[in-house]
Amino acid sequence: MTSLPLGVKVEDSAFGKPAGGGSGQAPSAAAATAAAMGADEEGAKPKVSPSLLPFSVEALMADHRKPGAKESSLAASESAQAAGGLTQPLGVPPGSLGAPDAPSSPRPLGHFSVGGLLKLPEDALVKAESPEKPERTPWMQSPRFSPPPARRLSPPACTLRKHKTNRKPRTPFTTAQLLALERKFRQKQYLSIAERAEFSSSLSLTETQVKIWFQNRRAKAKRLQEAELEKLKMAAKPMLPPAAFGLSFPLGSPAAVAAAAGASLYGASGPFQRAALPVAPVGLYTAHVGYSMYHLT
């Protein structure tokens, strides 16, 4: 048994040995025949380079590197379809392979775009947004997911002081009655029962009206008196600055007199004249001067 270089085994019994010393020519003829048959079979199946496949790494990277990569990928897909071993790539219209010169869209869809994967037309992907009628999905229209409408806040009601239902109306006093009541109040602020009865009958008023008017007039007089006392206290406070160097001396003491004299002498002497502080008369105020707040009136 003899082994051929192309891997074809030929038995001696199959081809036979020719007579007359021709044993070396028969195996060489069989090897040539087998090589020719293998070449025919390989020619019937054309080899496709893996780099020309539209989904290979080289084809995907070439789309971003070279501007004419899409034309080369289309040509590769045409040759693959002619061989019958590949399917139509995604994102390429069915009639674009047969007519490469036909006018195409300004921007064809890519292999991994939304339109290429879902095979949707371009007009379905681009929707005209109308500001007047915005489109809302069903889950947004449901009350479960949509926010509640804004509540209009009503203006706060005016809260007035509520009077009693059985409150008596206010008594409108005349000018003559008011003058008589004021004159009587200056004479005597508290009236006895007999005086109140006699005075109310003379003014054509009830005793209760006269009694309430005198109560209100006494409260008003008390408020006015307190305000006058406060004004007198504010006016009685001395308007003097605190003592120099944080020292306080009672006015009228020898230390205060010496300090005032030294301040006046210091202000009058020296090349630069300084205005001396006015010295209050000794003995006018006997209050102890210190760090305190002085109110201006």
UniProtKB/Swiss-Prot annotation:
UniProt-listed InterPro entries: HD, HD_metazoa, Homeobox_CS, Homeodomain-like_sf, Msh_Homeobox_Regulators
PTM description: Sumoylated by PIAS1, desumoylated by SENP1. Sumoylation of Lys-9 and Lys-127 not required for interaction with H1-5, transcriptional repression, inhibition of myoblast differentiation, or binding to gene promoters.
Compositional bias ranges of the Low complexity kind: 25-38, 70-83
Position of the Glycyl lysine isopeptide (Lys-Gly) (interchain with G-Cter in SUMO) cross-link: K9, K127
GO biological processes: embryonic morphogenesis; inner ear development; negative regulation of gene expression; negative regulation of odontoblast differentiation; nose development; positive regulation of cell cycle; positive regulation of odontogenesis; regulation of odontogenesis
Stored CDD domains: homeodomain (cd00086)
Gene Ontology annotations for the cellular component aspect, listed alphabetically: nuclear periphery
Membrane listed as a keyword: no
Gene Ontology MF term list: DNA-binding transcription factor activity, RNA polymerase II-specific; RNA polymerase II transcription regulatory region sequence-specific DNA binding; transcription cis-regulatory region binding
Signal peptide: none
Parts forming coiled coils: none
Keywords associated with the record: Developmental protein, DNA-binding, Homeobox, Isopeptide bond, Nucleus, Repressor, Transcription, Transcription regulation, Ubl conjugation
UniProt cross-references to Pfam families, sorted A to Z: Homeodomain
DNA-binding region: 166-225
Annotated region (Disordered), positions in chain: 1-50, 63-110, 127-157
Localisation: Nucleus
Task of the protein: Acts as a transcriptional repressor. Capable of transcription autoinactivation. Binds to the consensus sequence 5'-C/GTAAT-3' in downstream activin regulatory elements (DARE) in the gene promoter, thereby repressing the transcription of CGA/alpha-GSU and GNRHR. Represses transcription of myoblast differentiation factors. Binds to core enhancer regions in target gene promoters of myoblast differentiation factors with binding specificity facilitated by interaction with PIAS1.
Subunit and interaction comment: Interacts with CREBBP/CBP, TBP and SP1; interaction with these transcription activators may inhibit autoinactivation. Interacts (via C-terminus) with PIAS1 (via N-terminus); the interaction is required for the localization of both proteins to the nuclear periphery and specific binding of MSX1 to the core enhancer region in target gene promoters. Interacts with H1-5.
Similarity annotation: Belongs to the Msh homeobox family.
The protein's name in its UniProt record: Homeobox protein MSX-1
Gene source species: Saimiri boliviensis boliviensis
Gene: MSX1
